[in-house]
Amino acid sequence: MKRAFALLVLAAWAAGSALPAAETAAPARAYLILPFENTAEDRSLDWLSAGLAHSLGEYLLGFGQQVMDDEERTVLLEGSGIPPGAPLALASALELGRKTLARPAGLRVDRLVLGRFNVDHGDIAVAARVIDIRREKARPWQSRSGRLKDLQEVNRDLALALARDERLAVSDGRADLLRKQSEDVPLLAFETYCRAVTGSDSKERLQLLRKALQQYPGYPKAAYQAGALLAREERWEEAAAVLVKASSDPFPYESDYHLLNALVALGRRDPETATTEARRALSIADSARGHLLLGRALQAAGDRAAALAELEKAKAADASDAEIEELRRALDDVKNPRRTP
């Protein structure tokens, strides 16, 4: 598989996960979630600042919204001279939001989320509010509390409260999935996962994700994130070995998980598995990426006609996707093989 195509596919995941059609009926909003302010005196809990923001972002992705990724947010905050987790007054938050709207490139957010947390004698209180940047209007604070050991349930309840306040549609089945995934993962494994996904060093991130999988065997999101890191380095066999450890499809990356499996299978020269995984991804969410990967798999299996059909479906889904021309050239090479002198 060509390296350029693999890099294009992996880069596309930074924009957020693909979602079931039922979850994306309404136009998606774009959110910038700032690291939560740590109002507790225990600095060992600083990991929660970025961890809670990332986790809330995963929930919003699962609710069909767009979320600025951690790396882009870090660059934005550093450029604005704002330390991660620093408290922001409403006026400062609105000014930051205006900057994102004025940028020539990148995600232009229309919602800003401020958050804070406090831990006292084993109890945690978490609060967040949404600011509508275009209307310059702040919604009321939403807060939830509970035992620190039940952090994920508290965070899930906060996410659902924000969704209701924002009038985002969350199906009963989606809510049940949130409940199951938040109750199953031990707090220690969740902490390790948060430290991994909010880190900047890829080697350290991979080590932490492997550790999270040891602390909670089958941890779906840890397996997915580790697999994505390995795939970026084209370590296909290792990526396949870690992806198969996921005990279930990882929320909110269900479709992307199967797309990643398809990409890895192509890297391992296994078009049959790639075809199966791409079709699974498309059964969850129709996307240009899904049709392009399926087209790649069918091309590798020697079915040019079916690959061309998938190329047309990809164009219909998103004609601007940069991978379309890459696949078109590959199919043209098959039709008109270059002659060597």
Model-derived features: positions:
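Short coil turns that delineate tetratricopeptide repeat
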Residues: 217, 251-253, 285-286, 319
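TPR alpha-solenoid repeat register
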Residues: 222, 255-257, 290, 323-324
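Short beta-strand->alpha-helix linker/helix-N-cap micro-motif
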Residues: 24-100, 106, 110-124, 137-141, ...
